[in-house]
Amino acid sequence: NDRGCHLISRLKGKGTQTVLLVAHVDTVFKRGEAAKRPFRVDENGFAWGPGVGDDKATVMEVIYGLAALKEAGFEDYKEIIYYTNAEEEGGSPTAEGIVAELSQQADFAVIMDVARPNWGIVTQRKGNAKYKITVTGKGGHHGNASQCCANAIHQLAYTITELHKLASPMPGKPEDFTAKALEARGIVDSGQFIPPNTVNVGVIGSTNDKISVIPGDAYCEVNVRCFEVAEQKRLDAAIKALADKIVIDGTKVEVTGGIVTGPMEKTPAVQKMIDVYSSVVAEEFGGKVNEWVAGGLTDGNRTAKFIPTLDALGVENYDEHTDHESVDLKTAVPRTAAFAITLAELLKTGVK
């Protein structure tokens, strides 16, 4: 389309299993950024440039990994589908439709996105829901008409406190869970402190801008994220039920929106994928895989709706989405080899 080229590549084999590999070729940067900061490799073996790790290096990892399997004569698969998404960063109906269609043609998916440090992979991701809560009341003069008005902001304030009750408790004081604070305490952050269910009232407003006027309208926009499908559904029902919880007579609450994208859950099939990758890393490289959970979304959330999914098997990257993003090229060969060996094993044995 006019935003990029969505490329779907297919390899036919002689086996029974089909895998969907997903990477992306777009970046968060505007056109012309590469001319300002062209690709370069420094003396320490780090590559630099816009999108160098998210997700350019990993796009190449897949190509070299598949080339190695082909050179080795590996054909124990039904089909390998490799989709490079041109609109992953911003999302689009085009990309989401392609991912959904291809997922239903495969037995499992591997999302080739940015890896976490020290053999880190992502085994769970939160799902995403969005809501708009609109309160309609009756406005009027605060001094003379309070008795015949209905304050929409007061009702919204109550509704927001009810929203807050749906969220999981925070692990402690915010200042104790920054990257620096965890590092100072000798704790490796792998997302383990992310609360299971989070509710964020990110936007709030009213047409009223006078404190002497009782507001007749108010609204807020809410983002909800959960690690589990069951919890996502539970919160969805609870939020929609807030329309019936009126504490200010004369007001009406309307809740619109709902679940947008489901979580990427860690199922028994996903655990098998993790076990295979962990064995490969240990046996071939003497490494230990670190499992991460993430509150952000990737195409892995969309494939997980249909098939077991493992995420973030790319090359190790630092400071993505910034002008100092870099890739540790020393991880390229080990990561590519581990990916290829794991892929071959999963295609031979299946994931269920």
Predicted regions and their residues:
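Fold-independent oxyanion-binding glycine-rich loops
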Residues: 23-25, 52, 85-87, 112-115, ...
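Short, conserved micro-motifs enriched in small and acidic residues
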Residues: 47-60, 89, 150-153, 326-333
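Acidic/histidine-rich catalytic neighborhood of metal-dependent amide-processing enzymes
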Residues: 55-128, 179-192, 347, 351
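A structural signal for isolated positions on well-ordered beta-strands in alpha/beta enzyme cores
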Residues: 20, 81-83, 254
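Metal-dependent amide/peptide-bond hydrolase catalytic core
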Residues: 114-115, 123, 129-352
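Short coil/turn motifs at secondary-structure junctions
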Residues: 14, 26-28, 87-89, 138, ...
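Acidic/His- and Gly-rich active-site-bordering loop/insert found
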Residues: 1-52, 68-76
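Short glycine-aspartate micro-motif
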Residues: 18-20, 47, 107-111, 130-132
